[in-house]
Amino acid sequence: MADRKCLALIAHDQKKNDLAAFAKAHEATLSGWKIVATGTTGGRVLDACPGLDVTRLKSGPLGGDQQIGALIATGDVDCLIFFVDPLTAMPHDVDVKALMRLAIVYDIPMALNRATAEQLIDFRRT
């Protein structure tokens, strides 16, 4: 299964548990994907779903968002799920905006909340 699609998972601190729960609810579907995630988010997903193929990159504020952006730019990420916390100020907000911009520029599907992620996963499953 060398040509599996790659999904990037990111969540702000207050949304990490929500993303881990989302991954658990869709574990069977996600098992067909190669997953890249920022460090702490990837750890939470692996705690919830130890059988998933998750590559943990750096923490978002330490460059993980930019690492995922680079993977989008090289065509190595096919889809982005990023659970954003709109109510908390982020010191690395410019990195987040740059990441979203790359997802738009390279026209990959992007979900920024659970409702959209649910639709995206259902669509990608078919």
UniProtKB/Swiss-Prot annotation:
Coiled coil: none annotated. It catalyses: dihydroxyacetone phosphate = methylglyoxal + phosphate. Keywords: Lyase. Its EC number is 4.2.3.3. GO terms for cellular component: cytosol. One of its GO terms (biological process) is methylglyoxal biosynthetic process. The active site is at 65 (proton donor/acceptor). SUPFAM superfamilies: Methylglyoxal synthase-like. One of its GO terms (molecular function) is methylglyoxal synthase activity. SMART domains: MGS. Substrate binds at residues 12, 16, 38-41, 59-60, 92. InterPro entries: Methylgl_synth, Methylglyoxal_synth_AS, MGS-like_dom, MGS-like_dom_sf. Residues 1-126 form the MGS-like domain. Belongs to the methylglyoxal synthase family. Catalyzes the formation of methylglyoxal from dihydroxyacetone phosphate. This is Methylglyoxal synthase. The gene is mgsA.
